[in-house]
């Protein structure tokens, strides 16, 4: 394990051991403890009281972050020719069909999100081996299989993200950048956590939100008091 730098030690010292911070406090503190020279991502990790191996306890959904993610999201719109102008106008980085299907078959995955139409899913099913492991397979539940191509592209570009619980019962997502104001970080994190709470499966027993941590790339995690999420 590499030694901590002087700045990292100072940053770590700002987190009080064992303390659960309010979301408001944590959103300001995460900026103070970040020592990277680049604009680091701000991440939220929520441990849920669910058993993801059971279909009736799977948690997945979408959320539109009020201040976006701060990331440049590369969008591929796989659509019929009559929808190409709509997708391009909405801001899709790549627009087409057979040309891009062939590129993906050849291993090309230099994109973050694929948006497509129900009528085309038959062609895209064959790409599952390439897209599935990378989390790129379009899904009606996340709004990436739709006839409203333009709207879907705009939403993704503006900060709509999809998430799902992993096999350990944790949901992890990025809610912005360190360059965001504490208020923007808090608003985004609050929207994400509130959405998670609404998605609680009826089959889940006991405490649903077990823990919440806020961190930035390479920073320590800041424990958050779940009760503080809805506070103003």
Swiss-Prot record:
Superkingdom of the source species: Bacteria
CC annotations in GO: large ribosomal subunit
Keyword tRNA-binding assigned: yes
InterPro entries found in the cross-reference section: Ribosom_uL1_bac-type (IPR005878), Ribosomal_uL1 (IPR002143), Ribosomal_uL1-like (IPR023674), Ribosomal_uL1/biogenesis (IPR028364), Ribosomal_uL1_3-a/b-sand (IPR016095), Ribosomal_uL1_CS (IPR023673)
Spans through the membrane: none
Keyword field contains Flavoprotein: no
Gene3D superfamilies: 3.30.190.20, 3.40.50.790
Alphabetical keyword list: Repressor, Ribonucleoprotein, Ribosomal protein, RNA-binding, rRNA-binding, Translation regulation, tRNA-binding
Self-association and partners: Part of the 50S ribosomal subunit.
Assigned protein family: Belongs to the universal ribosomal protein uL1 family.
Protein name: Large ribosomal subunit protein uL1
Organism expressing this protein natively: Parabacteroides distasonis (strain ATCC 8503 / DSM 20701 / CIP 104284 / JCM 5825 / NCTC 11152)
């Amino acid at each position: 394990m590499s030694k901590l730098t002087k700045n990292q030690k100072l940053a770590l010292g700002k987190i009080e051991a064992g303390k659960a911070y309010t979301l408001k406090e944590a959103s300001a503190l995460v900026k103070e403890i970040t020592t990277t020279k680049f604009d680091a991502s701000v991440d939220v990790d929520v441990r849920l009281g669910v058993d993801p191996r059971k279909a009736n306890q799977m948690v997945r959904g979408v959320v539109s972050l009020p201040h976006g993610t701060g990331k440049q999201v590369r969008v591929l719109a796989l659509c019929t020719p009559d929808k190409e102008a709509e997708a391009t106008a909405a801001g899709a980085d790549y627009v087409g069909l057979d040309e891009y299907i062939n590129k993906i078959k050849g291993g090309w995955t230099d994109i973050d999100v694929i948006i497509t139409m129900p009528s085309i899913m038959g062609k895209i099913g064959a790409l599952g081996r390439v897209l599935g492991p990378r989390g790129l397979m379009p899904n009606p539940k996340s709004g990436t299989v739709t006839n409203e191509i333009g709207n879907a592209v705009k939403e993704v570009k503006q900060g709509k993200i999809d998430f799902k619980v992993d096999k350990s019962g944790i949901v992890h997502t990025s809610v912005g950048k360190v360059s965001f104001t504490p208020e923007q970080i808090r608003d985004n994190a609050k929207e994400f956590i509130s959405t998670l709470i609404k998605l609680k499966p009826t089959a889940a027993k006991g405490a649903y939100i077990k823990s919440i941590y806020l961190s930035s790339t390479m920073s320590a995690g800041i424990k958050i008091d779940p009760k503080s999420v809805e506070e103003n």
